[in-house]
């Protein structure tokens, strides 16, 4: 591993190659109601 990053590689990086992606919420926290229902089910 090099101590310093390769700045030439960073500067020559082509941002046009990156694809635009849609961000989606994945791990949303359960509501208090959901937690209570799960506790009742056990």
Swiss-Prot record:
Keyword check for Metal-binding: no
Composition skew (Basic and acidic residues), residue ranges: 1-25, 33-42
Gene3D superfamilies: Single helix bin
Annotated region described as Disordered, given as residue ranges: 1-42
One term of GO molecular function: actin monomer binding
Positions bearing Phosphoserine: 12
Modified residues (Phosphothreonine): 21, 23, 34
One GO biological process term: actin filament organization
Subcellular location: Cytoplasm, Cytoskeleton
Name of the protein in its database record: Thymosin beta-10
Function: Plays an important role in the organization of the cytoskeleton. Binds to and sequesters actin monomers (G actin) and therefore inhibits actin polymerization.
N-acetylalanine: residues bearing it: 2
Modified residues (N6-acetyllysine): 4, 15, 39
InterPro entries from the UniProt entry: Beta-thymosin, Beta-thymosin_sf
Keywords assigned: Acetylation, Actin-binding, Cytoplasm, Cytoskeleton, Phosphoprotein
Pfam family name, one: Thymosin
Similarity comment: family membership: Belongs to the thymosin beta family.
């Amino acid at each position: 591993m090099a101590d310093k990053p390769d700045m030439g590689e960073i500067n020559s990086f082509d941002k046009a190659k990156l694809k635009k992606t849609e961000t989606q919420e994945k791990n949303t926290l359960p509501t208090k109601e959901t937690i209570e229902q799960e506790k009742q089910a056990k």
